[in-house]
């Protein structure tokens, strides 16, 4: 019970910092990077670290968007870039998970779109809508348990739940024709991730499954567009840290000492965000807590 309470406090603190990011992002109108990563598929790399990347696919009759940014301002930036490519309506919005920085722009990007997420993401979003109405979130209209296919002619998007990983209800969006994937926060390019009520052990397995796909481009939840090379390194970081912490845990090393004894020198270029509990030490502590619950 104590570990669960501590985990929930961590989650609420992280969401609190996301609210701070929401406020800080208002009025920030720098230039994002938009890159074609396959036939009619585009990666939108946000210029705001507090707002997620997006991906959009243009079909013959409409557009599919993955993640919409932290708020209406960031959502407007996403929509502005979409409109440089196509004037077709946004038919589908997919939210990779419930954190506000990935879905705060839903109502701007796709006011008439069908919003799609896992069942878990919808439940958590509804709870946030009650506790934090100032976020103006919009929960999914369509939910799924394991997998859903979206036919946006002439293309296909495969949306699936890889198991508990970053959260307990993440969604990955694979575009088979384009050999590309939008990963939400299951992958951050050269950064320690924030860890929610998920499973790092399964997270590594999910990344292994992703790496087995035919992939040319990988859109991370935040930071630069990537390939399998960067995804492999992020996977290796999580696996390495998990192995180290598990060894210390099995040797009855206390959590405070375990956090101090990890070796992460080869990941020195990874970004660290203490305010989001997204540091090497934070990651090690969460892994330790997850091992305690097994």
Residue ranges and their predicted role:
Residues 34-80, 173-175, 180-183:
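Conserved beta-strand hairpin/beta-sheet module of binuclear metal-dependent hydrolase folds
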Residues 3-18:
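Bacterial N-terminal signal peptides that target proteins for export
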Residues 62-64, 68-72, 149, 156, ...:
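Metallo-beta-lactamase
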Residues 116-141:
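Acidic/polar short surface loop at catalytic or gating sites that assists cofactor/ion binding
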Residues 19, 212-214, 225-294:
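Accessory terminal helices/loops
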Residues 40, 57, 67, 82, ...:
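Divalent metal-coordination and catalytic microenvironments
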Residues 60-64, 73-116:
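Active-site metal-binding motif and surrounding structural segment of the metallo-beta-lactamase
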Residues 25-27:
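N-terminal signal peptide c-region/cleavage motif recognized by signal peptidases
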């Amino acid at each position: 019970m104590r570990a669960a309470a501590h985990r929930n406090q961590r989650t609420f603190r992280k969401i609190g910092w996301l609210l701070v990011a929401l406020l800080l992002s208002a009025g920030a109108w720098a230039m994002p990077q938009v890159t074609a990563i396959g036939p009619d598929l585009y990666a939108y790399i946000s210029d705001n670290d507090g707002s997620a990347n997006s991906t959009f696919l243009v079909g013959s009759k409409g557009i599919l968007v993955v993640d919409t940014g932290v708020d209406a301002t960031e959502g407007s930036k996403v929509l502005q870039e979409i409109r440089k490519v196509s004037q077709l309506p946004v038919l589908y919005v997919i939210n990779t998970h419930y954190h506000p920085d990935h879905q705060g722009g839903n109502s701007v990007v796709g006011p008439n779109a069908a919003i799609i997420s896992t069942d878990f993401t919808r439940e958590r979003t509804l709870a946030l809508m009650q506790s934090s109405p100032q976020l103006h979130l919009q929960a999914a209209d369509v939910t799924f348990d394991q997998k859903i296919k979206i036919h946006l002619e002439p293309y296909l998007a495969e949306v699936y739940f890889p198991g508990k990983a970053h959260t307990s209800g993440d969604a990955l969006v694979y575009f088979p024709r384009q050999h590309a994937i939008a990963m939400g926060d299951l992958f951050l390019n050269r950064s320690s991730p924030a860890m929610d009520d998920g499973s790092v052990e399964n997270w590594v397995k999910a990344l292994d499954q992703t790496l087995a796909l035919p992939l040319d481009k990988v859109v991370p939840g935040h930071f630069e567009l990537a390939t399998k090379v960067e995804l492999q390194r992020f996977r290796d970081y999580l696996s390495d840290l998990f192995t180290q912490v598990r060894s210390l845990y099995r040797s009855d090393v206390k959590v405070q000492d375990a956090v101090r004894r990890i070796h992460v020198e080869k990941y020195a270029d990874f970004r660290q965000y203490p305010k989001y509990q997204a540091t090497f030490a934070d990651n090690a502590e969460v892994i330790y807590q997850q091992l305690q619950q097994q």
